[in-house]
Each structure stands twice: as structure tokens, then as C-alpha cells.
């Protein structure tokens, strides 16, 4: 089901790229002032049928990792090919979304994969390709004529990115303002989109990050609680994958899920998409599958015994 959803999202984004935005999308871009962040001078950021390009790009990063890793562990050749095609389509969609932070989703997922695999050769290969990837974006100008590559490259050169510098300055202001507000300003009072609910510092500064938004609304207490819950669930899932799951195919799928969620959590630092639809639903659903992996493994084992 998710594979069909992903392919549909990619197809819609490609349609936007080559046929343009429809009347409803154009109206939304204008009325919500999304055109300021999506219709840039050097690149157009496509968002498919998602709420915005940040949400779309990050979900495509998740799909890249989920289907890319799953393709490695699937037994049937036809399914492996199908998943690999989806992963390639998703990474293409990530680039045309123009979401720089989403690029760190697949990178984070691959890093976690090396630890979960407990494979020295894979770790070595990951380090090699990671260095190659970093050098390509941070220290070369190869492909600079391509607007998508040029925009993604700025993520590896933050000191040259004006928006990054502004974000850091805004976070300094918020740190001073929220110093004596451990529970934050209140739900719904984070980011410029909340101006209609009240004028205060947290509604005058763009959050540009899900974690900053959570910090604004619920304070350091809420942010720490959120991270404890999600990190604990993810670590529990990683433990099950490494030491408890016996079915190889299931282990591969759960590894893909864990790596995808980890990548999304990293990507959420640069984009406030984590609580938006359908991301929030997808994350909770897959976390539930992940932490119930041992139970699923037992059911599969019983099913195989019954067949024998």
C-alpha cells in the first residue's frame, strides 16, 4: 500500500514539474504565501499532494531508505526489483522537492544500517561512500549547472547559506526568551503561522524545525519528553533487530523501518514536517510495527511450524 502511495506521490510531483501547478495549487501557493518558499528565483520546489515541499521531500527520503533496504533482504527477485525501482523514483522526487534537510534522511538511515548489520565490510563501504558523498557536495562543483544539485549542495556549506545563519540567530533569541518558560509558550503558539492566535516572540519567528517548534510550544520539558519517548522506542526496535529477531526477511524489513524512522528524525531538525499529515500517522504506525517485531517473529515461526 505504501509503495502505491509513494509512486502516486512521485507521479504527481513529476506532473507538477512538467505540466505546472493546477488552479487549486496555484491559489494555495498565493493565499498561504507558500510561493515565497516554493517559487524561488533559481528553483521551483514541488510538493506533490503533500502540505509542502519539506513534508514531501522528507517522506520521499523515508521511502528511499525503506524500499532500498527492503529490496536487499527480499527473497523474491520480482519484489526486489519493484522495491529498488520505488527507491530510485523516491530519491528523484526528493531532489525535485528542493528540500535540503531531507537529504540527511537517507544519509542517517544508511549510517544506522551499518551498525544494525554488524558487518565490518558494510561499515567500511559506508564510510567510503559517505566520504565520497560529502566531498562531492561540500568540496566540488560537479553538476553545479543542475539547480537541484546546486540547492542541495548548500546544505553542506551552511556558512555560505544566509537562511542557515538567520536560523541560528533566531534560535539564540528563542533560547533567551524561553529560558524561564520550561513548559513553553503553549500549544499552537509556535511559528509565524500562529500569529492569528496571538502576537508574541514565538509567533514572530519562523521555527524552521520540528524540534524548535516543539521547544517553542512545550518548552525544554516537552522537547526532552518527546525525544525520550521516540528515541527509547527506536532503541528498543534496534535491540530486537540485532538480538531477538530470527526470521531474516522480517529482520530486513524491520531494519529498513528503523533506518527510515531514524532518517526522518534527523531530517526533522531542518523541517517542521514531523507532526503533519501523513507523516505523523506513518511514523507512529511503523514504530508500532518495529517495537512489536518480536511478537511478529514468533507468529511467523509458528506459521512455518504448522506448515511442516
Task: Please identify what each model-predicted range represents.
Residues 1-28, 34-42, 48-116, 238:
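Alpha-helical transmembrane segments of multi-pass inner-membrane proteins
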Residues 8-10, 89-93, 131-139, 261-269:
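Aromatic-anchored segments of alpha-helical transmembrane domains
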Residues 11, 16-21, 97, 114-158, ...:
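A membrane-periplasm/extracellular boundary helix in multi-pass inner-membrane enzymes
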Residues 25, 75-81, 121, 247-251, ...:
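Transmembrane signal-anchor hairpin modules in multi-pass inner-membrane enzymes, especially those
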Residues 29-30, 34, 40, 142-145, ...:
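Long extracytoplasmic/lumenal interhelical loops at the membrane interface
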Residues 47-54, 182, 202-237, 262, ...:
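A conserved mid-to-late transmembrane alpha helix and its immediate loop/hinge
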Residues 65-66, 107, 256-308:
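Transmembrane alpha-helices of multi-pass inner-membrane enzymes
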Residues 71, 82, 90, 107, ...:
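Hydrophobic transmembrane alpha-helices and their immediate junctions
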